[in-house]
Amino acid sequence: VGSEMCIRDRPFIVANHPAAALLLKTGALGLSASQAIAASVSAPDWTQLWVPTPHPSIILLYYILLFSIATQPIISRPLLLKIVGLAAAVGMLLHPFRLSILLGQPPTTVTILNVGHGSANLVEFTNGRVVLIDGGARSAPGYDCGERIIAPYLWHRGIGKIDDIIITHDDTDHYNGIFTLLTRFKPERLWLPHLDENKPAFTRLVDRARRQGITIITPAAGEIIAGDDEQMSVLGDHRAAGLTSEDDRGLVVRLTSGGKSVLFPGDITTRRELELVAVRTQVRSTILLSPHHGSATSNSPALLSAVSPEWLIISSGTS
């Protein structure tokens, strides 16, 4: 059955035949198979490689080495070029930027990243261990602070792997950037205050970590996360039966190193603050990350007096 049309005064026959539908469906099978093959090939981790940004001087040494290799056939003194190339190669291997990692003993550094209203704190220990405490931000849908802020900073620092990620609290502004970091930095351990199956996004994060073989740890009160000369420990009992607020059931982490200390209290409220002070928990710290992003329901005078910080940092955006 057909119908006749006229295009630019010329007759044109449009066929409506069962064979046409069969041909279209046959072609669609090929397209679907191609899409499935492309998806399966691109899915594994080995199809993409994420690396930290090399130091500018390493890039310079690389080009010197490349130049020495490429110009040997046309230079009258190839021995000199070989020496220059060898020196460049040795310089790349023993670059001060790499020596600080190989020899150890750089000072422990703590970086509070500006993610707006959220929390992302990087700790680099003297032994090379890298710990991220929280990694999230209150942001528009589709914006990933892990991909846009945290990962670029880590690459800028020359960090290609995170050893531990600690999530102090299961609000999204503490962890929604960590999905990306699990894939790109492959941490060995993920520390959580608890496993809350009532929060789908949080559950998806935990499930992804398990699929990647990451060890899931829910630490007890007083548990030591890092030891030796530097110590990172969990303060207070975040599992106490009387704690009904989700904010108060988060982790409070204290880092001490070289006579200095930093307190990461998550989103705890005044009630949990007073309990920490009442049992004489060692909370005195050089730096205090303001509880709950500086909220009026936290930051009690009792806690501020007990911590007595030299610096108070509020990780919050404009409202």
Predicted regions and their residues:
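Non-globular, low-confidence helical/coil segments that flank catalytic cores
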Residues: 4, 9-319
